[in-house]
A protein has these predicted regions:
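Residue-level recognition of short, solvent-exposed, well-ordered loop/turn junctions
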Residues: 129, 136, 184-186, 295, ...
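N-terminal export signals
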Residues: 1, 7-31
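Short, structured patches in soluble enzyme cores that scaffold and shape functional sites
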Residues: 139, 161-163, 170, 177, ...
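A generic local secondary-structure boundary/capping motif
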Residues: 40-43, 53, 124-126, 146-149, ...
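N-terminal non-catalytic cap/leader segment that marks the start of a structured domain
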Residues: 5, 10-12, 31-156, 325
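Short acidic-glycine loop/turn motifs at beta-strand connectors
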Residues: 58, 65-70, 193-195, 265-266, ...
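Structural signature of FAD isoalloxazine-binding scaffolds in flavoprotein oxidoreductases
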Residues: 66, 152-169, 185, 320-331
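Catalytic-pocket segment enriched in acidic/His residues
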Residues: 40-42, 219-341
């Protein structure tokens, strides 16, 4: 790590800058929402008890729901039962359940088998496709701050990515096209906002959250370290894989009690728990909402635990390269896989 970057981190910190089981919906356990209609509203009634995803079909992003029969094709189910339904996760988050819970029950109990896809055969899309904001939190695990020789932050250190970074489960990160050499992983829990939040309290903050997903804040360290601003090392195309799913908040429970791991070519590199966060999810949402308004669909990468390559002694730093296969695992949320080319 350059002295320039280390000095910046210290100033910012002090001044305030094994496959895991994933729940699915069964015909006995679907919460039917009230339906919010097609008009976008600021605070829709959020869907509950669902594992949702986007998949690609005919150059479109289509909403799927993970069930015990496979991935429900929501659009085809809506057509069969002649009802309206959200078209993708962005629509679901922005406009609420829109009767999706009832539709899933109908499909499970009366739908044709053709409505359900084998999960191994779908082409995933990013779990959120068009957030207004992608917010990231730096140095938010105590042991990670220690391994990089930085003090524990006094306030959350916020930075951002852009939508060009969004990537999917089973996706590809084309590092060979990036003018950099020091590629690094960062396993991260992602918060998906469900309601407009401005100046919310810590006590209420998580009630504004739609759900959670597995994410990866992929980074080019040599670009990141060129200046005190991290952006150019964080915003390359495809540098923010997220997925496979979003679990609604009620299925996750306490987001700060989840095992989090990073694997590279089958070798575990990071192994921690979200309880090591310096600022927990409620604190992050509350703090961020006091800086700017969070909108439904905004996503927050909550920081990475210890074990990143940049935290190793220099003689042990072996940077990622084309051909490497990465897998990010977070308890309950599923395993996010992608390959470097």
């Amino acid at each position: 790590m350059s002295n320039q970057r280390r000095d910046f981190l210290k100033v910012s910190a002090l001044a305030g800058s094994a496959a895991l089981a994933t729940p699915f919906i069964s015909s006995q356990a679907v919460a039917a929402g009230p339906g919010a209609g097609a008009v976008r509203i600021a605070n829709p009634e959020m869907a509950k008890n669902m594992v949702v995803l986007n998949y690609k079909e005919d150059n479109q992003y289509i909403l799927g729901v993970k069930t015990d029969k496979g991935i429900l094709q929501v659009a085809k189910a809506a057509k069969q039962f002649k009802v309206k339904a959200p078209v993708n996760t962005d629509d679901l988050i922005a406009n609420g359940d829109q009767g999706l819970g009832k539709l899933v029950l109908l499909a499970l109990n009366k739908g044709k088998a053709a409505l359900f896809l084998d999960e191994s055969k779908i082409e995933y899309a990013p779990a959120v496709t068009n957030p207004e904001k992608i917010v990231c939190v730096g140095l938010n695990y105590a042991k990670h701050a220690k391994e990089t020789n930085n003090p524990i932050p006094k306030l959350p250190i916020l930075f951002n990515k852009f939508n060009n970074t969004l990537n999917s489960h089973n996706g590809v990160v084309a590092v060979s096209k990036v003018n950099a050499e020091k590629f690094d992983y960062e396993a991260e829990l992602v918060i998906v906002m469900g309601k407009r939040a401005y100046n919310v309290s810590e006590a209420d903050a998580l009630s504004y959250v739609f759900g959670y997903a597995t994410g990866q804040d992929f980074t080019a360290r040599d670009l990141q370290q060129r200046s005190s601003q991290w952006m150019i090392g964080k915003t390359n195309d495809g540098f923010a894989p997220i997925g496979p799913y979003i679990l609604t908040a009620d299925l996750v429970g306490n987001p700060n009690q989840l095992k989090i791991e990073q694997y590279v070519n089958g070798e575990v590199r990071q192994s921690s728990n979200t309880n090591d966060m310096v600022f927990n999810c409620a604190q992050i949402v509350s703090y961020t909402s006091k800086i700017f308004t969070l909108e439904p669909g905004d996503i927050i990468f909550t920081g990475t635990p210890e074990g990143v390559i940049s935290g190793y002694p220099k003689e042990k730093q072996v940077w990622l390269k084309p051909g490497d296969k990465l897998e990010t695992r977070i308890e309950k949320l599923g395993n996010l896989k992608f390959t470097l080319t």
